[in-house]
Each structure stands twice: as structure tokens, then as C-alpha cells.
Amino acid sequence: MEIVGCRAEENTCPFRPPAMLFHGISGGHIQGIMEEMERRSKTESRLAKGGQMNGRETNMPPMSPEKPALCAGCGGKISDRYYLLAVDKQWHLRCLKCCECKLALESELTCFAKDGSIYCKEDYYRRFSVQRCARCHLGISASEMVMRARESVYHLSCFTCTTCNKTLTTGDHFGMKDNLVYCRAHFESLLQGEYPPQLSYTELAAKSGGLALPYFNGTGTVQKGRPRKRKSPALGVDIVNYNSGCNENEADHMDRDQQPYPPSQKTKRMATSFKHHQLRTMKSYFAINHNPDAKDLKQLAQKTGLTKRVLQVWFQNARAKFRRNLLRQENGGVDKADGTSLPAPPSADSGALTPPGTATTLTDLTNPTITVVTSVTSNLDSHEPGSPSQTTLTNLF
């Protein structure tokens, strides 16, 4: 689309020499000079117009008085000095408009034609775009940023929770069911309302046709399971693993029992993988407090990104391992399972005890610049890093 110059009057010359004072020149010479200047100006103007028309002859043939151009919009003759050339047709400046929104396209950089109709960029992509948003079902332009979930594509503003309309950004956990997007909280509520609470993650997968309803955070979810015999079935806790992409050789695993369904089947224990910074944070806090309360669990959940239930189960298992280790030390310091000798329990004067009520600083290992001050109660012992009891605790994990 371009603006092309049309006709110009050739019978008049716009150049008029200014009044000048000629000294020592007769009147006849002055008249000859003025006629020569006027002739040269006419020649230059004709050459300039001829060059301009020849430069655009590939786009539009020069107009002639015998065959005036017709506007493709209104069908009238074009007698204006300037007109528009779009899709190999001539248009009045006022006639080139979008057929949908009637937007004037004379100042736009682009316009689109489809089946003889003219569209602006927004209406063309809205009506004829190949990819459409899975939420609003409108077209998505090629230069627009999108969010992808499985095979669906969404506008950034349309990638929201179906229940609460919360905008989901990169890194947020979300769930999908029936091609609908849910935030983490409402997806958990949806699962709890649809399936009985005693069903484990394995039974949920079987009930859903072999494919469970996991959470998504941009990468695949890593989960491991192994059969294990138990003397008596116990009601277990099924926790969805939110930590994806973990290397099983570089991570610790937490085993959880599951209730069998139906009762004739063997029980299975699922394993949750932890990342290094999560383990360091939990172990550091376990050295200070073996039984954190709800407030401490909330702070740890914010640091590690784990749920409070996951943290509760981990601390419960850690306390059980710690008690078993103390019993083994009291029975002779030899582990009957593998025959390895364990360090002896520390003496009363082996480490310096922290006075009651002393504030102990716990550094967030995930972000070294953040420091959390926790008050240690009088019934807990805080040992120095070099004490034997600290070495014993490290060997547990």
C-alpha cells in the first residue's frame, strides 16, 4: 500500500523570478534572460515528473485523461492529487477501510485482503488465524506471546484458573482436567471431591484409565514406586510429588505407606524425591528442633517449596531413625542389620549446651542472604558442629 501522486497542471509554471535590478543591461537583453530562465524551469519540472512516474511504472501505469482511474471502494473516479494503491487496485484515501471495524487504513502499515474484502491486522487474525486460544477461542497472532499446556495454547491473559480466575505465570503449579486449567489449591479440592480420601495415587491412576492427574510445572513429574510386604496394613498418606527433574542418585527418598485397595492386593510404598537444598534446610532445622510446630512448618514450607504434610512426614521419619540409632548405641553400638559400628553417644561434657532461651540463627540455605532467627527451647540441645552427636546425626541420612 502506497500513496501515489496523480496529475499536475502543465500549462502553468509555478516559478516566477523575483524582481531584480539590472545595471548596464538593455531592456531587450533583460527580456531574453527572463524567457530563458522560464523555459529552463519548465523543462526541469517535466523531467522531474517523468522520472517520478517511471519509478512507479511497475506498480501502477501512469494515468491518462482518456482513461481515469476508478476507486475500488466506492467505484467513483479518482480526481484527487493523491490516491492509495493496495492489492493492485486504486483507492480514495477515505475509501480504504476495514470491512469489519471500519478502521481507516490510510495511515496503517499493513492491510489484509480475503475474498475481495479488506481487513485490518486485528480482525484478520481474529477471523482467519490458524491457532486459536483454548480459553477464549480467538485467533493468536504470530508475534504474540502464549502459554502452552499439553496440546493447548492460551493467551497470557487467558491462562487462568477456571474456578478463581487467578492468572498463572511461569513456574506456578497447575492441574488440568477435561482441558480446563486449575490452580494448585482448586485442583486439590477437585481431586478430594471426586475420589474417596482412602484411595492412593496408584488407585487414582487406575481409576482414571491408567493415567493419573498430576500437577504440572513445565517439566515431567518424577515418581518412583516399589512393592514392599508389611505385617499389617496401615492407613497411609499419599502425597503428590511436586519436585520434578530430580536425580535419584543425588536425592534422598521418603517412603510412605498406602492402604491396599482392594484388600487382597499387596501394599505399595511411594517415594518422594527431595532436592539438595531442601534436604540441607530440613536437616539443619532438625539439628535444632526435632518436632517443629505449625509456625515452623509454614516457614520451612516457604523456604523449601514443599507442603506442610510432606515436612511433617519427613520429620516423623527422621525422629524415628534418630530414636532407633540411640537404641542401637545403647545395645552395644553395633547395627545388627549390616554389622557396621555406630559412634558412641556423646558424654555430658562433650559439647557446649546452649542456654535456655538463647536465640539461634538458622540460615536459609536456598538463599544465603536471608537469615531466620529461631528461639530454641530449654529442653533441646544445640551441639557444636564438631561434636560427636552432630556426626551421628549426619550418618542417619
Swiss-Prot record:
UniProt feature, compositional bias: Polar residues: 387-397
Pfam families: Homeodomain (PF00046), LIM (PF00412)
This protein's GO CC annotations: nucleus
LIM zinc-binding domain span: 69-130, 131-193
Biological processes annotated in GO: dorsal spinal cord interneuron anterior axon guidance; negative regulation of DNA-templated transcription; neuron differentiation; regulation of transcription by RNA polymerase II; spinal cord motor neuron differentiation
Biased composition (Low complexity): 353-363
GO molecular function: DNA-binding transcription factor activity, RNA polymerase II-specific; metal ion binding; RNA polymerase II transcription regulatory region sequence-specific DNA binding
Gene3D superfamilies found in the cross-reference section: Cysteine Rich Protein (2.10.110.10), Homeodomain-like (1.10.10.60)
SMART domains: HOX, LIM
Location of the protein in the cell: Nucleus
Residue span of region Disordered: 40-60, 330-363, 378-397
Keywords, sorted A to Z: DNA-binding, Homeobox, LIM domain, Metal-binding, Nucleus, Repeat, Zinc
Reported function: May be involved in gonadal development.
Protein name: LIM/homeobox protein Lhx9
Organism: Gallus gallus (Chicken)
Native organism taxonomy: Eukaryota, Metazoa, Chordata, Craniata, Vertebrata
UniProt gene name: LHX9
